């Protein structure tokens, strides 16, 4: 039997930002029994002993008091370290470029947090993500958020039927300017707060400095695939495929880009030109596949795919290799497909699921120089 809103408990994850603040406000206005939870996933005390999470939690407290909902802080630092940060370091160690946001959603926000919320008697969890959940054809579907510029289904691609059945995304039908306006009209403390960018546990810190605290940097040679030495790199983990900035190669002609890595010999491969052929692939093997639907997939189907966040949709053919692996054939060659990153599949507005990019090919030949 469906419960009325006032009988339905929704536990919302609140970050201290404007999105989750407005999501909580909307749920409260819709009559739900709302509880705000601040997740502390990382000990981010800086060298002066200042913890930025404390400021964010203070904003959560202020907003919850303004809205009139109870709030708690929950510590998930151990789970985050074990499930997200360890993976993050392992991927960099392997010369790949990880996507911690995907793992955080899968393991923390929609697993550890969901379990905690259910223990609090929650019927649903909610977050400030730009995405939508719909129940159609006997199952839950995840749809892109209405705001194309903010859609976050790319990062939510590993969510299951079970997780979606317990999830609400109050902002899915709204656009960012509307959300700012709502926060302003309601006088919320976070109305003018700047959006956070980058990886949550690094924050405003320098990426190189942060990473070197956990992984020793191993400087090495920077050269073309034909062996022409162009300089030295600071450590392979600091570079991603297609990167231009930070190479420090002068001279005339087209700009230089990172085109590959040789982990064994600690070489960073570089070459000139944004549209350099070395940066393009047309076939991908991806692993750690997760589908939103439990329905059996055809062994081969056409859809679109994003190989990185905010990329345009690319037409592809997906071939199921086994339950953990897919082969992706691209209609057109795609630039800078990066091992370790997520590839996410779509059918129109519906997010079908995703996987981790493992191997890249061009014209049937594996691009070994990608690492």
From Swiss-Prot:
Subcellular location per the Swiss-Prot or TrEMBL entry: Cytoplasm
EC number in record: 2.8.1.13
Span list, region Interaction with target base in tRNA: 99-101
EC class name: transferase
Reactions that this protein is recorded to catalyse: S-sulfanyl-L-cysteinyl-[protein] + uridine(34) in tRNA + AH2 + ATP = 2-thiouridine(34) in tRNA + L-cysteinyl-[protein] + A + AMP + diphosphate + H(+)
Cystine pairings recorded for this chain: 104-200
Site label Interaction with tRNA, positions: 129, 341
Cellular component terms (Gene Ontology): cytoplasm
Keywords carried by this UniProt record: ATP-binding, Cytoplasm, Disulfide bond, Nucleotide-binding, RNA-binding, Transferase, tRNA processing, tRNA-binding
A GO molecular function held by the record: ATP binding
Protein residues bound to ATP: 13-20, 39, 128
Pfam families: tRNA_Me_trans, tRNA_Me_trans_C, tRNA_Me_trans_M
Annotated segments matching region Interaction with tRNA: 150-152, 308-309
Keyword DNA-binding set for record: no
Any Gene Ontology biological process: tRNA wobble position uridine thiolation
Residues at the catalytic site: 104 (nucleophile), 200 (cysteine persulfide intermediate)
Function: Catalyzes the 2-thiolation of uridine at the wobble position (U34) of tRNA, leading to the formation of s(2)U34.
Protein family membership: Belongs to the MnmA/TRMU family.
Name of the protein described by the UniProt record: tRNA-specific 2-thiouridylase MnmA
Organism: Bacillus cereus (strain ATCC 14579 / DSM 31 / CCUG 7414 / JCM 2152 / NBRC 15305 / NCIMB 9373 / NCTC 2599 / NRRL B-3711)
Upper taxonomic lineage: Bacteria, Bacillati, Bacillota, Bacilli, Bacillales
């Amino acid at each position: 039997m469906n419960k009325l809103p006032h009988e339905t408990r929704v536990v919302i994850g609140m970050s201290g930002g404007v999105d989750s603040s407005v999501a909580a406000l909307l749920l409260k206005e819709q009559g739900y029994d709302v509880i705000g939870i601040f997740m502390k996933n990382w000990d981010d005390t800086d060298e002066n002993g200042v913890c930025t999470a404390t400021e964010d939690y203070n904003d959560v407290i202020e907003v919850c008091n303004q809205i009139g909902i109870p709030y708690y802080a929950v510590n998930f630092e151990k789970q985050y370290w074990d499930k997200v940060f360890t993976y993050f370091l392992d991927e960099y160690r392997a010369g790949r470029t990880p996507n911690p946001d995907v793992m955080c959603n899968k393991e923390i926000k929609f697993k550890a947090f969901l379990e905690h919320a259910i223990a609090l008697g929650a019927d649903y969890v909610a977050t400030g993500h730009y995405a939508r959940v719909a129940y159609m054809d006997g199952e839950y579907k995840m749809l892109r958020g209405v705001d194309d510029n903010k859609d976050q289904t790319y990062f939510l691609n590993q969510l299951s039927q079970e997780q979606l059945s317990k999830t609400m995304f109050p902002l899915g039908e709204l656009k960012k300017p509307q959300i700012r306006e709502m926060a302003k009209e309601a006088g919320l403390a976070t109305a003018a707060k700047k959006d956070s960018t980058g990886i949550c546990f690094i924050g405003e810190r320098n990426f190189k400095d942060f990473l070197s605290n956990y992984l020793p940097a191993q400087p090495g040679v920077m050269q073309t695939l034909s062996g022409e030495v162009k300089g030295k790199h600071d450590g392979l983990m600091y570079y991603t495929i297609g990167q231009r900035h930070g190479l420090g190669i002068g001279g005339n002609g087209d700009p230089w880009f990172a085109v590959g890595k040789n982990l064994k010999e600690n070489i960073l491969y570089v070459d000139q030109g944004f549209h350099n052929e070395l940066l393009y692939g047309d076939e991908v093997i991806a692993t750690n596949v997760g589908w939103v639907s439990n329905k059996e997939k055809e062994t081969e189907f056409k859809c679109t795919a994003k190989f990185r966040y905010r990329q345009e949709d690319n037409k592809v053919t997906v071939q199921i290799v086994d339950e953990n692996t897919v082969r992706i054939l691209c209609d057109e060659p795609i630039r800078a497909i990066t091992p370790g990153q997520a590839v996410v599949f779509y059918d129109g507005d519906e997010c079908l699921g995703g996987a981790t990019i493992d191997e890249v090919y061009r014209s049937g030949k594996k691009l070994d120089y990608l690492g």
